[in-house]
Structure formats: C-alpha cells, structure tokens
UniProtKB/Swiss-Prot annotation:
Key words, A-Z: Cell inner membrane, Cell membrane, GTP-binding, Hydrolase, Membrane, Nucleotide-binding, Protein biosynthesis
Protein name: Elongation factor 4 2
Any Pfam family matching the protein: EFG_C
InterPro entries: EF-4, EFG_III/V, EFG_V-like, EFTu-like_2, G_TR_CS, LepA_C_sf, LepA_CTD, LepA_IV
PANTHER family in the record: TRANSLATION FACTOR GUF1 HOMOLOG, CHLOROPLASTIC, TRANSLATION FACTOR GUF1-RELATED
Annotated localization: Cell inner membrane
GO cellular component: a single term: plasma membrane
Amino acid sequence: MKHIRNFCIIAHIDHGKSTLADRLIQSCGGVTQREFHDQMLDSMDIERERGITIKSNTVTLNYTAKDGEAYQLNLIDTPGHVDFSHEVRRSLMACEGALMVVDASQGVEAQTVANLYLALEYDLELLPVINKIDLPAADVDRVRGEIDEDLGLDPFVAIPVSAKTGQGIEDVLEGIVKNLPAPKGDPKAPLKALVFDAFFDKYRGVILQCRVMEGTLKPKDEIHFMHADRDFTVDELGYNQFKLVPKKELTAGEVGYIVAGVKTVQDIEIGDTITLANRPADEPIPGYQPARQVVFSSVYPMSTDEYQDLTKALEKLSINDAALTFEKDSSAALGFGYRCGFLGLLHLDVVQERLQREFDIGLVISAPSVQYKIKLKDGTTQDVDNPTYWPDPSTIDSVSEPYIKAQILIPEEYVGPVMELCREHRSESQTMNYLSAGRLEVTSEMPLGEVLFDFYGKLKMITRGYGSFDYVPIEYRKTDIVKVDILVNKEPVDALAYLVHRDKSRARAMHYCEQLAEAIPRHQFKIPIQGAIGGTVIARTTIAPYRKDVTAKLYGGDVSRKKKLLEKQKKGKAKMKQFGSVNIPQKAFISVLRTDKD
C-alpha cells in the first residue's frame, strides 16, 4: 500500500489541468504514442472543443521512481467549473493529495482559492505546480509570492513546469511520490468503498469508479449500497488504464472500476458507500452530499413530432449524468416538453448542446429560473421554479429566493466598476480583502437569480478578462418577486411568462415586448403586445397593421362613396381585432428567449 498514490489535479479554468494530465500519462507510458491524443481524459467531443472538463475521469499509471521503486499512481481528473463542484468534492474524497496548478502568467484566481478551501476541507496534502512557464508573460517569482501570500502554501516546494513542452514533468512525478502521502486503510476490515463516478456502457450497464477505503473486494461478492439501500453482485473489477484491465481483487487504498449489473445511474447514488452484504460496515463514509439542482428551465422540441426523440435523448443523457433531473411539462404555445433541473448555466448549456449534437433535436429553451420558496397566507409553503405554478398574488404572504456568496478576484484598478456591477445585481454586503500586490478579493452576497443571466460575461468584459468568479450557495432570504405575463393581442402566452424582482420587471418586460414586435409579422389589424403583473400593464408596444387601400378601385364619383368604403373597412377591422387570432411564429419565441437580458 505504501507504493500507491491517489491524487487529483485542481486548478482554475484554463490553467492547464488536462494538458498536465496528458504529459503525466505520456511520461508513465500510460498509452502508446499511436493511441495518444490531446485531452486524453476528456471523453466527450464538447469537452475537447470547448477545452473544459465536465466529467471526472480516472486512470491508473505505473511509475518507476529514481530510487528504483515501482509506484501505482491513480490520477483522478476533476472539472474546474463552479457548476461541477460536486464532482470535484467526490473526486477529492477519493484522494490523499492534490496537484494545485497555477498559471505562471495569470497567477492565483478565484477557483484556485475555492478549490484550495475544498481540498483543505478534505484534509488533502497539496503540491503546488506552476504551469505555462514557456509563455513570454510567465513570471514564476511573482506567482511563487502569490502561492505563499494568497494560498499559504510553501512556495519553495512549488514545481515550475510547462505541460505544453514537457519541461519539469519528471520533477512533478518525483514530487508526487515524495510529497504526497500513501493511503491508509486495513485490507482485512469490513469493506468500505466510495463510488465517486459512474459511466454507462451499452453492453455492460453502469461501470462504477470506486476508491476502496477499507477491506477487500472480489468478483462474485454481494455488495450493498448504504444510501440507496440496493444490493448487486460484482461481475468484474479491475483498474482503468484507458481500457478496463480486470484484476482478481481491489484492496484498501486502491482505485478501480466495478461492473455489477447496474442498469442506470438512477439505480444508485454517486457518492454512495459500498459495503459487503454479508459483512457490512457500521457506517458510511462521511461527507456524502447529493447534487443540488439550482437552475430550472423548460425544454421543448422545435417540432412536436420530435417529442418522443427528446424523451429518449433525455433518458440516455441522464444515464450518464446523474445530476440532470426532468419531468413532463406542457405549454399551450409550444406543446409538450420537459421541465429540467441543472447544476448551473454551464450545465444547462452543455446539456442543450449535447441534445442538439448527439441526438440532432432542435430545441426551444425557456428563460432559466431558480427555485423560490413561497409562504402562503394560510400558513402552507410551496417551492416554485416554474411561472406556470405561481400562486395568485393575493394568497402570497412572503417569497424567499436563494442567495449565494460570490468570491471575485480582480486587479485593484477595476474595483469601482466591479462594485457597481455587484450593486446592479442586487448585492447586499460587500467586503474587500487585499491579496498580493495590486490584487483584490471582493466577497459579496447576492441572489442566485441575478447571477444566472449575464453576470459572469459582464464581469469578464469590465475587467478585460482578468476578473475571476466563484460562488457557494448560502441560504434563502425574503424578497419581492413577481410573475410577469406577456400578452399578445390581450391573450397571455404561457411560454413567455417569467419570474423577476419587482425593480427589474419593467425593463425586462419592455425588452420582451420589443423583441416580439420585431419577430411577429404584421396582420390586418393592430396587435398590442403587453407585459403585465396581475391586471397591471407595465410595458407595451404595438404592431401596426397593414393598410389595404379600399378606395383604389373608385374612379371619380362622389366623396360619400369613398367614406362608405372606409367605414366598412373600419367595421371589418374592429371585428377582426375582436375575433382574429395572432399567429406567433416559432422564431419569435427563440429570438426572445435567446437574447434574454436584464
């Protein structure tokens, strides 16, 4: 066991986690040169294209150190984006140590600090790595200072590397062996294994990625999931070395895969503890937290014929993505669809892109919303994330919305505009903390609903790309949320209703009305488009009618003839306005929902 090292790589987005992992894999001969490609641990096309890691991944590497000893290195790759922090948590629980990667030109950023706190929470040994030293803008000494001041880690242990050129990779491998601790655990104790990930194989069902904490696991063992309370029989187990390599047993300290005839990810809970059914452990591994959906949105197929395809596609996606939830939903305007729960906006974006790409389904997605807690006057409470189920305002006593604690790292010259941006997004308390020279940490409490739309994009724009942002959910607080209905020709359109803070309701309603006025074709009669809270109209635009020249056929003659025809047209238009239906094209919905802004 003393020759095993379980470690993960944690860093801010774009600091070079996946490239460093590639170099470690190459140095240890994890794959042949012919099989190698960039971003080895990123299995989805969308991960490679966007250069982001979405799903945790694992690989077992064999390394012979300079002292001649052979080591087994289990590298657990982790996503860097705040949406997938629950994946990071589970990966950290499976490790004893972590490589803390910092970009030599960018320095310490918000998620570096957030991941540091997470790693310390799980009591991991950290080895700082300064990456991208081949860049012209690299400043290793400055970054060493930041590692010391901002992170409180020993700057002299930090290893300068260039994952791109391969410089310093051997030092990292030696550093892992020397500085990171070996796992502890008793192979003879009752089995305790942590399921930190799972993926679906169409021939073998769900393949579980596990870290054995205590005990030993063998094929044909009957295993019990402690949180899900389900039993399965192990068919096969072994190491993941880009292909599954079967072994006779997995013992305490090892990381490997288990095939146990599990049909879908929904049958088990990721983060669960496995034990033996005939010799169970007393209690599960502590620290288990189910994934929490924070963003909700309705997803409709472009054409109603694709509803069955959408159902199958969501079922297939959720086999691999346990954090995606969905339930049936319908709209008078858009037909049948699903109300889906996501971990954040990037998760929504990734699911949307995968549905369109992998399953070739055109989608209309409603404006994302968070879950509000409503206390009614009769003393009951409701959780509502869909405007359709918003209760009558006269019955509501109070509404609470989720708040987050945002941690923003910026160069000090941008502090004014960033504070203003936070205030625009209804930030409540702001504190500033000076880090190393010229850098500030702004901590702010603000509603999650305000961060959903464009906060991150605006922050990047204001700080010219230097600002970084991370958040943790804190609590629900009372607020003044209203439901705004959009009426076209005095008829409410359910798919366009949204929930918003009263102060921002008019601006957003005006934006919706203007977008619709551009997208809906003109009719023979005047069409009012209104935004209303209850019975009060707060915004309005009008689509002007076509005018047919009914007097064109007259040639000379009396003026009363002309008046008679105009009068007849006026009556016809009044009748049409009363009974005529307005046809709202699909592209009108898409244009409104896509360009949604505050």
